[in-house]
C-alpha cells in the first residue's frame, strides 16, 4: 500500500535537524520564519536568554496596507524589510537565518532578500 508523505511532518523533521546545529546568541540572534497559507511570520530570537527581540508578520497594518493579499511573495518581502528595519533600530545587524524546515524558495527566499536589502547580514 502506498502512503502519501505528510509534508508538514517532513518539514518538522527538517526543522529539528537544522535546529540541532543553529542557535541564536546575543551577538548573532536567530531569524526564525513561519509560513502559513495566508500569512508569514518572522521573529529574531536570542536562544541563550530565550527571548524574542523583534517580531513582524503580514498581519501588521504596515504590511496589510501595502499589499492586496498577505500570503504571497510581495507580502513576504515587506515582512522581511519590516523585521530588518525593527532589528536595525534595536542595534541588531547580523543574524543566523532559520528557514524553519521550509525550502529556500518562493516566500521564504523573498523574506530573506527583503531583510538583506533592509540591512541585515546573514
From Swiss-Prot:
Pfam families under this entry?
Answer: Ribosomal_L18p
Q: Which UniProt keywords apply?
A: Ribonucleoprotein, Ribosomal protein, RNA-binding, rRNA-binding
Return the SUPFAM superfamilies for the record.
Answer: Translational machinery components
- Indicate yes or no for the key word Kinase: no
Name a single GO biological process.
Answer: translation
Q: Basic residues: which segments have biased composition?
A: 12-22
**Signal peptide boundaries:** none
Give the region (Disordered) as residue ranges.
1-24
- GO MF entry, a single one: structural constituent of ribosome
| One Gene Ontology CC term in the entry | cytosolic large ribosomal subunit
Superkingdom classification of source: Bacteria
Subunit and partners = Part of the 50S ribosomal subunit; part of the 5S rRNA/L5/L18/L25 subcomplex. Contacts the 5S and 23S rRNAs.
Briefly state the protein's biological role: This is one of the proteins that bind and probably mediate the attachment of the 5S RNA into the large ribosomal subunit, where it forms part of the central protuberance.
Q: Which family does it belong to?
A: Belongs to the universal ribosomal protein uL18 family.
User: Which protein, by its recorded name, is this?
Assistant: Large ribosomal subunit protein uL18
Organism (species):
Clostridioides difficile (strain 630) (Peptoclostridium difficile)
